[in-house]
């Protein structure tokens, strides 16, 4: 089942900063079980309507940029959606969504550029 953007954000916020950047097999498994179908829909371009608002765009960036780092940890698949995440983040930033986002979550609009192999992205 494809989760809603609200479900993605509720899960991510409930997990909190302690889980966001730590290696935790149980957390990785929970993301994979709950959100793999949502990730696959996003990669297939079926969630482009999530770009419409700050909250839904934030959820889409998390699905495309953060979730694969947990779901596919240690495999090449971890990075497959990076170009898509950068595109969503770029359009969200152009619309000012980052500036409207609380500081604790704002970084998620910037991380796709940090993860990029291209120096120009990292210097943004």
PLM feature spans:
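Intrinsically disordered, low-complexity activation-like regions
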Residues: 1-75, 79-124
């Amino acid at each position: 089942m494809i989760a809603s953007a609200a479900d993605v954000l509720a899960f991510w916020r409930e997990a909190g900063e302690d889980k966001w950047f730590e290696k935790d097999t149980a957390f990785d498994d929970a993301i994979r079980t709950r959100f793999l179908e949502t990730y696959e829909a996003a990669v297939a371009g079926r969630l482009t309507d999530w770009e419409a608002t700050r909250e839904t765009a934030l959820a889409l960036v998390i699905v495309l940029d953060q979730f694969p780092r947990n779901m596919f940890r240690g495999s090449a698949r971890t990075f497959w959606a990076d170009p898509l995440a950068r595109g969503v983040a770029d359009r969200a930033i152009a619309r000012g969504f980052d500036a409207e986002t609380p500081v604790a979550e704002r970084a998620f609009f910037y991380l796709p550029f940090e993860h990029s192999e291209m120096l120009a992205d990292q210097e943004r």
